[in-house]
């Protein structure tokens, strides 16, 4: 077992052994294709009756709700099975529509680990324990953040070129924890990768994962940019031939 696996095992055991006063019950909003991180803004349209009920309760009682990526099942219809690590969301804006639907804006606050799912209401709830990210002020976190910084700048530049849009970063945060979450939110990668980042035990682990993902994405973006001009010429075709778009 490597150090990262040992760290994850310790974190799992810490959650299981959490004192009762550190546990809380959260309404759970399982989502497909969304991994919420602390500090991330999440707009949602609420139309299912069970989630209208849930959000109305959160508004009235000023409760957060938990956002968790779906592991199995669908958003609409029968209850989906979520991953075990998610992020609590605080509602900051509500727009009520005439037909009872709502547009809300929420912000991710803190990570949690699901200990027990409950389905005794129209929507899922769960007993959860706080899952703080650790080792943000260590030398290792600082060293890894310095390794990630230039990759982030290169990534934004190549992504801008590939998407033909003007993406800019005014300034990268100095704090390794803030940088780790910013990169996690910004990376254009799949849900599996995003969930892996969310489940990282500490800042060094998250930054190390991000460094590897950035290296992979940089190679892909460089290839896309290098071959785009050749593909455009190929699509035009030589005189007398028709090439499909």
What are these regions (language model features)?
Residues 2-245:
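N-terminal low-complexity, acidic/polar interaction/targeting segments
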